[in-house]
Structures are given as structure tokens and as C-alpha cells.
């Protein structure tokens, strides 16, 4: 894959039937606030939430696929009505199973991830997307580098571009 900020072709974008998101570093800015009792808090961008609503309205299937098992991920997925699979050290088998279950070819899917544990999923899909502030280890696997950072409008940017090219 090519390391580029270039938006994929309209033909490629029109083939996207599903979007799979990592959570930390995509829905969030990859930081966590930890209380003295160990409870974790993150900040998500409301514009990104609107982006997922727009994708849902366009009948794009969505999944949050997270290495961490965390109530924050479940809560955000529930609020946005997005299926969540979490607590998986190896994401690729889960991605493959989910795509098969939803009758979506890997080439008809986009994966948005930001770190080394997303690398195999990024390599597996038709459109590999990373936020601008993704870890350097995933840049070479990206077909599309967003201009926005994770947790700061990256999902909304993706949704707006995808849907404006349909």
C-alpha cells in the first residue's frame, strides 16, 4: 500500500459497504484519564459521532474492534448503535469472522486504525485509513491518511469524504 494523503478514487469509495474502527486513538485522542479508584474516562468528539450517524443513514455497516475490554468502549458503541467486539489480542480473525457474518468482502471494507495492533487489519481491507497522528508503524500500510487526528474529527472527515463521493 502507498503512504499517501490522497483520497481513494470515487470508484473505490463507492464499493465500501462496511467500516471497522479501532477505538483508542480513533474515537479518542489516545489518552485516558484514570481516577484514584481506577475508573477510566476518555473524550470523544461529537462530530465523529455525527459522522457515524451519517454512515448508518447511508446503510454502511460498522464495527468497533478493540484490543482493550473497557466499559467506555461498550458505552460509546451502544450510544452510537455500533456493534462492538473487544478484548481481542489478535484482531484479524475477529475482523474476518465479522465480515463473513455480514456478507462483506474485505475489499468492500475500510478499516480505521492508529497503531501496531491494527496493522494486519489495515493490510486486509480494501481501504486502510489512519488518523494524522497515528503511530509511525502503520503509515506504510495506509492507503489514506486523514488530515484530522484521532478523537479530533478523523471519523467525521472520513464519513464526509466517503459520502460526498457517492
Set out the residue ranges of the language-model regions.
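Substrate-recognition element of Asp-dependent hydrolases with the DxDx(T/V) motif
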Residues: 26, 51-76, 85-86
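Mg2+-dependent phosphoryl-transfer enzymes with acidic/Ser/Thr/Gly-rich catalytic loops
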Residues: 41-45, 84-85, 92-166
Amino acid at each position: 500500500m502507498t503512504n499517501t494523503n490522497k483520497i481513494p478514487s470515487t470508484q473505490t469509495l463507492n464499493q465500501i459497504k462496511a467500516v471497522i474502527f479501532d477505538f483508542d486513538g480513533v474515537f479518542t485522542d489516545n489518552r485516558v484519564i484514570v481516577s484514584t479508584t481506577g475508573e477510566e474516562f476518555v473524550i470523544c468528539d461529537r462530530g465523529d459521532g455525527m459522522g457515524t450517524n451519517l454512515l448508518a443513514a447511508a446503510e454502511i455497516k460498522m464495527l468497533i474492534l478493540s484490543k482493550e475490554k473497557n466499559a467506555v468502549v461498550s458505552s460509546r458503541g451502544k450510544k452510537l448503535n455500533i456493534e462492538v467486539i473487544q478484548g481481542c489480542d489478535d484482531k484479524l480473525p475477529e475482523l474476518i469472522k465479522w465480515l463473513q457474518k455480514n456478507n462483506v468482502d474485505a475489499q468492500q471494507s475500510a478499516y480505521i486504525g492508529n497503531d501496531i495492533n491494527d496493522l494486519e487489519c489495515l493490510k486486509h481491507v480494501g481501504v486502510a485509513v489512519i488518523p494524522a497522528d497515528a503511530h509511525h508503524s502503520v503509515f506504510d500500510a495506509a492507503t489514506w491518511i486523514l488530515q484530522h487526528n484521532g478523537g479530533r474529527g478523523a471519523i467525521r472527515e472520513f464519513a464526509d469524504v466517503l459520502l460526498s463521493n457517492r
